[in-house]
Swiss-Prot record:
Catalysed reactions, semicolon-separated: 7-aminomethyl-7-carbaguanosine(34) in tRNA + S-adenosyl-L-methionine = epoxyqueuosine(34) in tRNA + adenine + L-methionine + 2 H(+)
GO cellular component, one term: cytoplasm
Matches recorded under Pfam families: Queuosine_synth
An example Gene Ontology molecular-function term: S-adenosylmethionine:tRNA ribosyltransferase-isomerase activity
Species: Vibrio vulnificus (strain CMCP6)
Record protein name field: S-adenosylmethionine:tRNA ribosyltransferase-isomerase
Quaternary structure annotation from Swiss-Prot or TrEMBL: Monomer.
Amino acid sequence: MQVSDFHFDLPDELIARYPQSERTASRLLQLNGNTGAVKDGSFKDVLELVQAGDLLVFNNTRVIPARMFGRKESGGKLEVLVERMLDEKRFLAHVRSSKSPKPGTLVFLGEEDQYSAEMVARQDALFELHLKADKTILEVLEEIGHMPLPPYIDRPDEDADKERYQTVYNQKPGAVAAPTAGLHFDNQLLEQIKAKGAEFAYVTLHVGAGTFQPVKVDNILEHHMHSEYAEVPQEVVDAINATKARGGRVIAVGTTSVRSLESAAQESLKNGTELMPFFGDTEIFIFPGYQYQLVDCLITNFHLPESTLIMLVSAFAGYDHTMNAYQHAVSNQYRFFSYGDAMFIEKKTQ
């Protein structure tokens, strides 16, 4: 398949630049992967769609304020977007400046040069930096960092984003983009779902900025997927096995939960074992033709045209059903992307 097969026209005004006043106030488009039928509703309908015995799998990563502004030794301005923390002092980052800083030079971080970091080496599009401070990278980011809103939101971050570009159940710092399907859940809705007899499990996938990188090849088979760190602990494996045994459904909240679970499934298939915990980097690329191993339903936002995520959804619901649902969403003025509306998708099984 070609990348252009996943194109759709999206009017600029349908890109959500701010969240709704309440988390659960978004709209929800239901899609049946077998029939292609769509149904319009509101996100609170999730309470009716989830059944007793189902398992919802959330990504509990926490978005870090990963964007810093500063300058080079020469005085030129730069912007640093942390992609991954290697340890408490070393990190990989995207660096934007008129000229790339050279290895061995210092960069000054913060509006008043509060901190400095040494440029250690370049790794493809990323730079390795070493913080020269008696604080950890996380502590420095909490002090001078900005929330790393996606490029299409196209505005400076605001104080409200510190809360709203974050799930209510976040636990483990490390993401530089939010697992956005989870943004629609508030504590009240979570309690109501639990009261129905559904169970919850938590994976961790630290979403990288690579999630916004465009696919630069025409043939999707030639695309090299970015790497992200994921954790699927033993308790998630146990919860999935118990859910399958009782006839419940595994409902992934977000594409990052899907990629975590399916990474664990693929690793176990490769090793010829039953489902095992997974801790490590994943470059899993899911596109039409992929056979899902674990996930039965998917809650997800609307994704960018020609992105790897619309390909993942197409593999889940069927290509034609997915593209038709997206056309329906555009025609009915759903809000798109991170702060936009959501879908509830039942997997295509026939």
